[in-house]
Amino acid sequence: MILGASGSGKTTLLSLLGGLDTPKSGEILLEGKNIAEMGLEQYRHNCVSFVFQNYNLIEYMTPKENVEMVDARATADTLHQVGLTDDEINRNVLKLSGGQQQRVAIARALSSPAPVILADEPTGNLDEDTAHDVTELLVERARSLDKCVIIVSHSNEVAAAGDVILRFSHGEITVE
């Protein structure tokens, strides 16, 4: 978990880890390999998947179609595992609630072959109870699939679900 106030650099770090931005100096290593040398497109496709605060779903598709874009084999089962019903799986994503859309985004990230999931404020648009449920779901499902999940949040409650917390505060990073 990466925890800190707005503007503390949490999302910048996630952008660097995801290959969405390049460092001005130094390098980012994954399993000892510089991600810039892997080819960023290949890195983003094979090594990391994303869960964004705004869900980043294809709006004219159903949840099933959104997940099939990542892995044609992982459809209904994955969507059921994140708590969606058969009816919800086949609806247009715009007809789903924010919590349901976030579950679709999580299912899509979990379906990716990538071993790392980067989640930027994945519960920022959700009420407290739904945020707790979605965080637990993401962390538990990622663990069961042997994936590493890195969640950026400003919420102590969300961060409590993590094994390790990096706290960004006043230009310093502490590990808890």
In which residue ranges do the predicted regions lie?
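Helix-to-loop junction immediately C-terminal to a conserved catalytic motif
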Residues: 18
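Conserved ABC transporter NBD signature motif
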Residues: 26-34
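ABC ATPase NBD coupling module
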Residues: 35-49
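Conserved ABC nucleotide-binding domain
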Residues: 78, 82-94
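Conserved ABC ATPase signature
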Residues: 92-96, 100-102
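Hydrophobic anchor residue at the start of the ABC signature
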Residues: 106
